[in-house]
């Protein structure tokens, strides 16, 4: 887990995207390159990456961190995108958000040469998004070695319901 200083760089927006939600925004971290580099270093050294063949990053903020980790570890990155964003044959699943419902898709061809994956996202809240990606990978006969996130909302206890290890850098 990272320092308290990093958690201070996460901005919080009350009642966004709907009333009752306090949105944790990781984007201000990008304005601090030294801290971002340390964050990526911390995320990249997680044990879950050692036995993975590739990374699946979740639309859209997960792409930022997944790309950096992919480059640092020289591991391929696959994207899980929201509806209507990917061409070709897809695996698609729906999921529940802390504040609604959505779906994600992965290109079948993108994962065919890899067996084990780490899922990367910016934030773990209810775990619905991570489980959605996990279900798509399982449907394709793939393994999940873990989930790596910048922020975890600890009070929601999503990690207790996920069937794979979770590595988070900041817990609120």
Swiss-Prot record:
Organism classification: Bacteria, Bacillati, Cyanobacteriota, Cyanophyceae, Synechococcales
Purpose of the protein: Catalyzes a salvage reaction resulting in the formation of AMP, that is energically less costly than de novo synthesis.
GO MF terms, alphabetically ordered: adenine binding; adenine phosphoribosyltransferase activity; AMP binding
Classification via Gene3D superfamilies: 3.40.50.2020
Catalytic reaction annotation: AMP + diphosphate = 5-phospho-alpha-D-ribose 1-diphosphate + adenine
Keywords, sorted A to Z: Cytoplasm, Glycosyltransferase, Purine salvage, Transferase
Record's GO cellular component terms: cytoplasm
Secretion signal, residue range per the UniProt entry: none
InterPro entries (alphabetical): Ade_phspho_trans, PRibTrfase_dom, PRTase-like, UPRTase/APRTase
Pathway: Purine metabolism; AMP biosynthesis via salvage pathway; AMP from adenine: step 1/1
Database matches in HAMAP family: Aden_phosphoribosyltr (MF_00004)
Origin species: Prochlorococcus marinus (strain MIT 9211)
Database matches in CDD domains: PRTases_typeI
Presence of the UniProt keyword Cytoplasm in the record: yes
Name of encoding gene: apt
Superkingdom, taxonomy of origin: Bacteria
Record's protein name: Adenine phosphoribosyltransferase
Main location: cytoplasm
